[in-house]
Structure formats: structure tokens, C-alpha cells
């Protein structure tokens, strides 16, 4: 993490359903390498990539998976040992608090956390309030983040709660860094504004996938995100320049 802040680009979406923008992941990796701090990939992508071994970015191996047919029911599909074998710098797990298989997901994350501690490998926990009748609000996001913290996660990824004030409650409820997820594809202006407000709330950075790899210029949007994340501009100052459209070389 540069100055305690980070830009992570998850690209683990392909196992869920066909997703535009990651047909050729190596192409995206080349475009954002040296800009993003790390990427999140599944083991099959790493094994078959012609680029991962040489990239400058950190590699986070994702251990959880589900398909769109049972989206919230995550299972473990890889291991800490496999992550080490593939040269990963960290692992990630996904827990949906409120899902039908919540108990199993919590158990798995706790066990993996202990293994990570044993091997000296950081664990990113993707923590979400998801399941039948589960609302996404400040309290449920706080709870999900806290579950990850209690299980031993080194960094938490969770959804933005809609305002600086509410997301600050999430950040303050755990004692490990929190990065904000990008969520569904959105406009550049909305993305930048959400990230700016999350950073003002005390976020440690972002973990943004679709809004990067589905962008017409992935390198440019990563540069724009980095500028916001590493900026200390006051909240009222407007976003200056169209960094997204043209980028900076």
C-alpha cells in the first residue's frame, strides 16, 4: 500500500457468468500493470496466463466461487497452499452474511485466516450483507465488515453505504483497512464521487472490477482513481479535469 492506500482490481467475475471485458484478461492486465497495486484472479486464470508471472502488480488469489444460479452461496475452490504455489502475494475469500450458507462461509473464512497467519500471507475478506430479506444499509454493512474483522481478515472489502458519514461508521467499526467495492457499472462521475466520499470517510482504497475492465480505457480510469485516492483535497472541491477520458501519460 502506497501511503496506506491501495487500488485493487478484482477480475474474478468470469466464474459467475459471462462478463464483458475479461474475455482476454492478459490484455487488461497489460493495460493496468504498473498502475493498479494488485489484481484478484482465480487459479485457472493464473495457470493459463502468459503475463501474470511477469507483471509488476501484486497477485491476490481468490479462493471463493459461485455461479449466477446460486449467487450468494459461496464455496471454497482453492487453498492457501495453492496460492503460495502460484506465487500469490495474498488470498481473498468472499462471505455473504445472511445467505443460506452463511455458517459454512464463516467457518471457511476463519480456517483460511488461520492458515494465512501460519504462512504469513495476508487475507482480503470480501464481506457483504446478502441473502433473502437482507437489506443493504449502514447497519448490515457494518455487521458484515465486523464479521470479517472478527474472523481475522487483514483487509476488508465491502460495499459503499451512500454517504461519507455512513461509511465512516463502517470504517470505524473495524481495526483493519477497509476498501470500497465498485459495485455495478456506473457513470464515471458517479464512480469518482463515491470513491472520493469513501476516502473522506477513512477508506484505505478501492477494489473495483467492472468499472475498470469494462471501461473503454482501463488504464485511464485507474489513473483517475489513484489521483482521487491519494489526494487530500477537501470534500467541497470539484473533481478537476477529465482524467478518465484522456488519462495522463
Where do the PLM segments sit?
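C-terminal helical cap(s) of enzyme catalytic domains, especially alpha/beta-barrels
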Residues: 199, 213-243
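Alpha/beta enzyme core
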Residues: 6-54, 58-67, 72-180, 186-208, ...
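Basic polycationic patches enriched in arginine
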Residues: 235, 248-249
Amino acid at each position: 500500500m502506497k501511503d496506506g492506500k491501495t487500488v485493487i482490481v478484482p477480475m474474478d467475475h468470469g466464474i459467475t457468468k459471462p462478463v464483458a471485458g475479461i474475455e482476454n484478461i492478459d490484455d487488461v492486465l497489460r493495460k493496468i500493470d504498473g498502475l493498479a497495486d494488485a489484481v484478484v484472479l482465480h487459479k485457472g486464470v493464473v495457470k493459463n496466463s502468459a503475463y501474470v508471472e511477469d507483471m509488476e502488480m501484486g497477485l491476490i488469489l481468490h479462493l471463493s466461487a459461485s455461479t449466477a444460479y446460486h449467487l450468494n452461496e459461496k464455496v471454497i475452490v482453492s487453498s492457501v497452499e495453492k496460492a503460495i504455489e502460484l506465487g500469490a502475494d495474498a488470498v481473498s475469500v468472499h462471505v455473504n452474511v445472511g445467505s443460506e450458507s452463511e455458517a459454512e462461509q464463516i467457518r471457511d473464512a476463519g480456517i483460511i485466516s488461520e492458515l494465512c497467519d501460519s504462512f504469513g500471507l495476508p487475507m482480503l475478506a470480501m464481506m457483504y450483507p446478502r441473502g433473502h430479506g437482507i437489506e443493504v444499509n449502514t447497519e448490515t454493512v457494518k455487521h458484515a465488515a465486523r464479521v470479517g474483522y472478527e474472523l481475522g481478515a487483514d483487509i476488508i472489502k465491502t460495499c459503499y453505504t451512500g454517504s461519507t458519514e455512513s461509511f465512516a461508521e463502517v470504517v470505524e467499526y473495524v481495526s483493519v483497512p477497509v476498501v470500497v467495492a465498485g459495485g455495478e457499472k456506473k457513470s464515471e462521475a458517479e464512480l469518482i464521487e463515491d470513491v472520493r466520499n469513501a476516502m473522506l470517510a477513512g477508506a484505505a482504497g478501492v477494489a473495483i472490477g467492472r468499472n475498470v475492465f469494462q471501461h473503454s480505457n482501463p488504464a485511464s480510469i485507474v489513473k483517475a482513481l489513484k489521483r482521487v485516492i491519494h489526494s487530500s483535497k477537501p470534500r467541497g472541491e470539484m473533481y478537476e479535469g477529465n482524467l478518465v477520458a484522456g488519462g495522463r501519460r
